Amino acid sequence: MLHVVSHPEAGEELEAAARWYEERQPGLGARFLDDFEKTLRRILEAPNRWHFIRDTNRKLNFDRFPCAIIYSVDNDHLYIKAVMDLRRRPFYWKDRR
């Protein structure tokens, strides 16, 4: 089983996006978080399945929202680098360790 480690800024991105969606429509923030959890489960089931996008980083898009989880795998750790809004500039997260 992989240990999930999230970059602090990725956690902030997740929380900010959930708040933003919730402000737009009550309950939408919870649906966003559900979609995040579903995406994370898919990654954990097959972490090496998804596309490389930069160096050792991989990306998997959410099903229902225009977002993606950017992550890398090292030994028994899955590092979440970003919870990226796909409408935002690409690779803003590239310097995160």
Regions found by a protein language model. Give the residues of each.
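Enriched for short, Lys/Arg-rich terminal
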Residues: A68, S72-R97
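Basic, Lys/Arg-enriched alpha-helical interface segments
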Residues: M1-N57, D74-H77, R96-R97
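Short Gly/Pro-enriched turn/cap motifs at secondary-structure boundaries
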Residues: K59-N61
